UniProtKB/Swiss-Prot annotation:
Belongs to the MurJ/MviN family. It comes from the Bacteria. The chain crosses the membrane at residues 12-34, 54-74, 95-115, 122-142, 155-175, 185-205, 226-246, 269-289, 311-331, 354-374, 382-402, 406-426, 454-474, 493-513. It is found in: Cell inner membrane. The keyword Kinase does not apply. This is Probable lipid II flippase MurJ. Involved in peptidoglycan biosynthesis. Transports lipid-linked peptidoglycan precursors from the inner to the outer leaflet of the cytoplasmic membrane. It is a multi-pass membrane protein. Keywords: Cell inner membrane, Cell membrane, Cell shape, Cell wall biogenesis/degradation, Membrane, Peptidoglycan synthesis, Transmembrane, Transmembrane helix, Transport. GO terms for cellular component: plasma membrane. GO terms for biological process: cell wall organization; peptidoglycan biosynthetic process; regulation of cell shape. It comes from Chlamydia trachomatis serovar D (strain ATCC VR-885 / DSM 19411 / UW-3/Cx).
Length: 536
C-alpha cells in the first residue's frame, strides 16, 4: 500500500469529502422539503424523537466505536498476513450481524408490550420506533463495512452511501405531501427502512472485492476477543454519550412540547461542518497514523497530526464565524416555508448560535483521540468522554431548571466540548511527551487565521449597517427591513449574497495579509495533494 504523507492524506480527504458533500447536500434538501410540507407539530417531533432513538440503539451496539477498535487491530494483522486480516474481518462482520438481529428482536418485543399500555403522543413515538428499529441492523452492517473500506482507502462510496436514504426521504415527503399527516409520517418510516437497506448495499462491492483477495483459512486464526476490552469501554462511553443526547431531547420536550424539533433541526446544521470535515479528517487520519505506529515512523505520525490539526482549525474557525453570521438567513432558507412557523425559525437560530461554540473542539477532539486509538489505548479517550457526558447532563438539568430555554442546552454542550478537548490533550501530553506542545503550537500558528476571520466578519456586519440590511443577520434588526423575505428565491438570494460578501472579504484579506492556511482552502492543487499556493 502507498506510503502515507500529507499529500496522500489530502487526496483521501478530498475523495471522502466529495462523496460526503453530496450526502450532506441531499440532507439539507431533505430538511427543506420536510419543513415545507410536514411543518413543526407534535407528530413531527415524535418522528424525530423516534429517529434519534434508533441511532441511540444502534450506537449502543458499537456504532462509530467499531472503527476505533477495528482499524488499528486490522492494520496490525494485515502487516503480519493478509489472510489473517481477511479471516478476522469475516468473524467481526458475522458477530455484529447476529448481535444486531438479536438485539433488535429483544427491543421490538419490549416496545410492543410498552406500546399496548400507552396512548397519545407517546404511543406515536413508540410505534414509529418499532417501525424504524429494523433499519438499525443495516445501519450496523453499513458501519462494519465502512471500517474496512476506510482501511482500503475507498472513501468515496462510504461518503456517498447516505445520500440514498436522503433521496428516498425527499421523494417520499414530496409525493405524500397531500396525504393525511398521520399516514404520511408512518409511511415515511417504512420507506426509510428500505433506504437504509440500500445504503448498506452500496458498500457491498468494495467489501466483496477485498474478501476475494484471500479465501484461504490462515494457520493462525485471530478472534474478535482481542477487541472485547476496547469495545466494552467504547460501548460504555457511547451509551452514556447517547444517553446524554436523549436527555437533551427529553429536557427540550419538558421546556417546550416542540422543543425536540428545535434541538434536532439545529443539531443537524451544527453537525454539518463537524461531520463533513472534522470527522472526515479523523476517518482518514486514524488508518494513516495506525500504519505509522506499526511501521515505527513516529516523526511521520507527528507531521500528519500537526498538518491535520492546522487544517481542521482553519476550516472550523471559518465555519464557526459563518454559523454565527448566517444562522438566521440559513435557517430561513432551510425551514421558513409552507406551514413552518416563524417562531420556530427564531427558536432554531438561538439554539444554533449556542451550538456554534462547540464546532472547533468537537472537530479537534477526535484527532487527539487518534493518538490513543492508534496505539490501541482506548481507556483514556473513553473515560474522558464519559466524564464530559455526565458533566453535560448535570449542566443541562441545572440550566433547564434555571433558564427554561431550549438554547441553554446548546450553550452547555459548547462549554463541555472545550473542557473535553482540554482533558484529552492534557492526557495526551502526559502519556506522549513528544506531542505535548503540539496543540498550543497549532493554536498559536492559527492566530493569523482567527484575526483575519474576525476582521472579515466585522467588515461584513459593517456593510450590513451601512446598507440598512441588518435584518438579514439579526432577529431584532437595527434598521427597518426594506422588504419582507417571504419567497424562497428572496431568502436564497439574501443568503448567497451575504455568504459571497463574507467569503470575498475573507479571502481578499487572506491574500492581502498572506494568511497561508486560508489561502490553502481555495487551492484545488492543494486539495489534490500539492503544497501551499503561496509557496508555489
Amino acid at each position: 500500500m502507498r506510503k502515507d504523507d500529507e499529500g496522500s492524506l489530502v487526496r483521501s480527504l478530498f475523495n471522502l469529502l466529495s462523496g460526503t458533500f453530496f450526502s450532506r447536500l441531499t440532507g439539507m434538501l431533505r430538511e427543506i422539503v420536510m419543513a415545507t410540507y410536514f411543518g413543526a407539530d407534535p407528530l413531527v417531533a415524535s418522528f424525530w424523537l423516534a429517529f434519534r432513538t434508533i441511532f441511540f440503539l444502534r450506537k449502543l451496539l458499537g456504532g462509530p466505536i467499531l472503527g476505533l477498535a477495528f482499524i488499528p487491530h486490522f492494520e496490525f494483522l494485515r502487516a503480519q498476513n493478509i489472510s489473517r486480516a481477511t479471516f478476522f474481518f469475516r468473524s467481526f462482520s458475522r458477530f455484529f450481524c447476529y448481535s444486531a438481529i438479536l438485539f433488535t428482536l429483544i427491543i421490538e418485543l419490549g416496545l410492543c408490550v410498552w406500546c399496548s399500555c400507552v396512548t397519545g403522543s407517546l404511543f406515536d413515538t413508540l410505534l414509529l420506533t418499532i417501525i424504524l428499529l429494523p433499519s438499525g441492523i443495516f445501519l450496523m452492517m453499513y458501519t462494519v463495512n465502512s471500517t474496512l473500506l476506510h482501511c482500503e482507502k475507498k472513501f468515496f462510496s462510504v461518503g456517498l452511501a447516505p445520500s440514498v436514504v436522503n433521496v428516498s426521504w425527499i421523494g417520499t415527503v414530496f409525493l405524500a405531501r397531500n396525504y393525511d399527516p398521520r399516514n404520511r409520517i408512518f409511511g415515511l418510516a417504512v420507506v426509510l427502512v428500505i433506504g437504509f437497506i440500500l445504503e448498506w448495499a452500496v458498500t457491498l462491492p468494495g467489501v466483496m472485492k477485498f474478501l476475494g483477495q484471500s479465501k484461504e483459512v490462515p494457520q493462525e486464526r485471530d478472534s474478535i476477543r482481542a477487541l472485547i476490552a476496547p469495545l466494552s469501554l467504547g460501548l460504555l462511553s457511547m451509551g452514556i454519550f447517547q444517553l446524554n443526547l436523549l436527555c437533551d431531547m427529553w429536557l427540550a420536550r419538558y421546556i417546550n412540547e416542540v422543543g425536540p424539533l428545535y434541538l434536532m433541526y439545529s443539531v443537524r446544521i451544527q453537525q454539518l461542518p463537524v461531520h463533513l470535515f472534522g470527522l472526515g479528517v479523523f476517518t482518514v487520519l486514524l488508518p494513516a497514523i495506525s500504519r505509522c505506529v506499526q511501521d515505527q515512523e513516529h516523526q511521520q505520525g507527528y507531521d500528519l497530526l500537526r498538518f491535520s490539526l492546522k487544517l481542521t482549525v482553519a476550516v472550523m474557525v471559518v465555519m464557526t464565524m459563518g454559523l454565527l453570521l448566517f444562522a438566521l438567513p440559513g435557517v430561513r432558507v432551510l425551514y421558513e416555508h409552507g406551514v413552518f412557523p416563524k417562531t420556530a425559525v427564531h427558536a432554531i437560530v438561538e439554539v444554533l448560535r449556542g451550538y456554534s461554540g462547540s464546532i472547533i473542539p468537537m472537530a479537534l477532539a477526535p484527532l487527539v483521540s487518534a493518538l490513543f486509538y492508534a496505539r490501541r489505548n482506548y481507556k483514556v479517550p473513553m473515560l474522558v468522554g464519559i466524564i464530559a457526558a455526565v458533566v453535560n447532563m448535570v449542566l443541562n438539568v441545572i440550566g433547564c431548571l434555571v433558564c427554561k430555554q431550549v438554547a441553554v442546552l446548546a450553550y452547555a454542550t459548547s462549554l463541555v466540548s472545550w473542557g473535553q478537548l482540554a482533558m484529552l490533550w492534557y492526557c495526551a501530553g502526559k502519556s506522549l511527551p513528544t506531542y505535548k506542545g503540539l496543540m498550543w503550537r497549532t493554536f498559536k500558528e492559527s492566530g493569523k487565521t482567527v484575526i483575519t476571520t474576525i476582521l472579515a466578519a466585522v467588515i461584513t456586519i459593517g456593510v450590513n449597517i451601512v446598507t440598512h440590511t441588518t435584518y438579514v443577520v439579526f432577529i431584532e434588526p437595527l434598521t427597518v427591513p426594506t422588504k419582507p423575505l417571504v419567497s424562497f428565491l428572496d431568502q436564497c438570494g439574501v443568503f448567497f449574497a451575504e455568504s459571497a460578501l463574507f467569503l470575498s472579504v475573507l479571502f481578499g484579506l487572506a491574500k492581502l495579509l498572506k494568511t497561508e492556511d486560508l489561502m490553502n482552502l481555495i487551492s484545488f492543487q492543494y486539495w489534490k495533494g500539492h503544497q501551499s499556493i503561496l509557496r508555489n
